């Protein structure tokens, strides 16, 4: 009898615990939904623009999946990992975003007005490695959709530091020894240059977050408590835009700044909706694409950063599609180029092959898409692509953006080696070297190249 009473008491206690656990889970669910749509209003973490940023959600895909209104979800461990955005005064002199502008912005990005940027997009910003380190000139990049934008901007940062800033020689030492101030100047110059090119060298538009809200929720528009607080600032001179960005750089490089989203917004408004409609074609009606439960940037976004025009394709000029529709490619050579290689790509698909406009840029810097991962290749010799003799034997430097990479990788490219020398080189390092994706990407530009990793074990 005593055992039966004891068992009943234990069973009752177990049911009570299960009920409590169920209620806690229920409350946690709604707390996460509420926090997601308020951009973390319970967030009490102060901004720390110089400290380390540790992701509280290492297992999330990070590609930018957003949820329809009322269904946003973030892991509870990530609720306090993003500080509030850097907010400027509403009296700074810009003009506020309207409901019509916010609606068009959502439509051109997602194809609807319901989706919003998720946690991993919101936490993405422009942060350099430590000054005076070997990777001082490189950005720390995350995973997912924002990564491609960060790496594309990285190309423009290298362009500024190596080739366009005044008073500095084009050598690797100047890259690796830059100070914090030089990092900030490089980022401001890179962002301003990209926006100016997108504005057809006529106007740049910069978006910043203010303290006031200008757009209310409607049945057709879901608020995110971020986009609705934008002010837009227009500049008719590139230098003025660069100074403004430099003066408000914390809005792009500060932890919690949503810096990558702000830059993407600025890019779209600089290009204008009218120009974007002319740039795009029937294959691309929106700038972000669903992928593996998230959102990634379409080629049009990368081409807009590289060339100023949101061309949806990588071939030269215009081509005719399968249904005789006109497809838009790249019209002019850009300063920073583009290479791509994928293990599943078909060499017979001419529309997917990168054209010479992107393969042979004005400067020896390339954004690389290798099996869907973005990286940078560059050469410190400005004459590489303008003097054919320079292309016989030269060095390229490779930055993968992976946290495991602690220093630049120097690759020596030999385009005139004999076939038996190339075979011997490949056999020496085994089949892993022979099929390195990095090498395959390089060979889309220099097809017969022998590539020496100079002691580094081939990776990527």
Swiss-Prot record:
Which GO BP terms, alphabetically?
Answer: protein K48-linked deubiquitination
Q: Where is the signal peptide?
A: none
Residue numbers spanned by region Disordered: 41-76
Q: Which Pfam families match?
A: MINDY-3_4_CD (PF13898)
| InterPro entries per the UniProt record, alphabetical | MINDY-3/4_CD, MINY3/4
Can you list the disulfide-bonded cysteine pairs? Answer: none
Q: Which PANTHER family match?
A: INACTIVE UBIQUITIN CARBOXYL-TERMINAL HYDROLASE MINDY-4B, UBIQUITIN CARBOXYL-TERMINAL HYDROLASE MINDY-4-RELATED
For this chain, the family text in UniProt reads:
Belongs to the MINDY deubiquitinase family. FAM188 subfamily.
Query: What protein is this chain from?
Result: Inactive ubiquitin carboxyl-terminal hydrolase MINDY-4B
- The coding gene here is MINDY4B
């Amino acid at each position: 009898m005593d055992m039966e009473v004891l068992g009943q008491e234990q069973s009752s206690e177990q049911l009570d615990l299960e009920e409590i656990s169920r209620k806690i889970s229920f409350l946690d669910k709604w707390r996460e939904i509420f926090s997601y749509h308020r951009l973390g209003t319970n967030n009490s973490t102060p901004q720390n623009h110089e400290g380390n940023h540790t992701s509280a959600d290492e297992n999330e895909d990070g590609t930018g999946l957003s949820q329809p209104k009322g269904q946003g979800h973030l892991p509870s461990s990530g609720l306090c990992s993003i500080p509030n955005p850097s907010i400027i005064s509403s009296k700074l002199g810009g003009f506020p975003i309207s409901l019509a502008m916010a609606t068009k912005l959502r439509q051109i990005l997602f194809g609807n007005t319901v989706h919003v940027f998720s946690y991993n997009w919101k936490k993405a910003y422009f942060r350099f490695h430590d000054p005076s380190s070997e990777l001082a000139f490189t950005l720390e990049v995350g995973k997912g959709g924002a990564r491609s934008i960060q790496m594309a901007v990285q190309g423009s940062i290298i362009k500024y530091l190596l080739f366009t800033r005044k008073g500095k020689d084009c050598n690797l030492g100047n890259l690796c020894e830059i100070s914090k101030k030089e990092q900030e100047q490089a980022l401001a110059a890179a962002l301003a240059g990209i926006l100016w090119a997108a504005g057809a060298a006529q106007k740049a538009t910069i978006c910043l977050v203010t303290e006031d809200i200008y757009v209310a929720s409607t049945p057709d528009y879901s608020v995110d408590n971020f986009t609705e607080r934008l002010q837009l600032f227009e500049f008719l001179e590139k230098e003025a835009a660069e100074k403004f960005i430099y003066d408000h750089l914390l809005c792009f490089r500060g932890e919690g700044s949503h810096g990558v989203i702000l830059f993407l917004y600025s890019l779209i408004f600089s290009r204008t909706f009218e120009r974007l409609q002319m740039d795009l074609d029937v294959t691309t009606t929106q700038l972000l694409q669903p992928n593996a439960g998230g959102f990634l940037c379409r080629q049009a976004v990368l081409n807009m950063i590289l060339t100023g025009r949101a061309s949806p394709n990588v071939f030269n000029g215009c081509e005719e599609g399968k249904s005789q529709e006109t497809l838009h490619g790249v019209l002019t050579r850009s300063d920073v180029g583009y290479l791509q290689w994928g293990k599943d790509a078909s060499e017979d698909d001419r529309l997917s092959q990168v054209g010479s406009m992107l393969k042979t840029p004005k400067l020896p810097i390339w954004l690389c898409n290798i099996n869907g991962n973005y990286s940078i290749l560059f050469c410190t010799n400005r004459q590489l692509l303008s003097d054919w003799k320079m292309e016989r034997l030269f060095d390229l430097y490779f930055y993968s953006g992976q946290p495991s990479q602690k220093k630049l990788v120097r690759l020596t490219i030999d385009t005139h080696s004999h076939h038996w020398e190339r075979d011997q080189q490949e056999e020496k390092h085994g089949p892993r070297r022979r099929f390195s994706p990095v090498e395959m990407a390089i060979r889309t530009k220099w097809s017969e190249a022998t590539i020496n990793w100079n002691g580094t074990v081939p990776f990527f």
